[in-house]
């Protein structure tokens, strides 16, 4: 998706799981079109080696971003069935505006 404004870059998160070390970083992006009164916002998570791409952008930049969407289903402790959508980033670059 093109013409997105970087609204917020979240801190790097790291940890260790059964499969080894992991890292991720989330970025909040917003549609950058002045004609839209209420622009959509997207929370995109970059993981593993893709985390380094976030270093090339800063808050306020206009970027293009590519992601895949995944829905994760789960059950709460009280038994309710829930679902959450995740946007997994696989490419982000600053646009020449």
PLM-predicted stretches and their roles:
Residues 1-97:
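Single-stranded nucleic acid-binding surfaces, predominantly the OB-fold ssDNA-binding core
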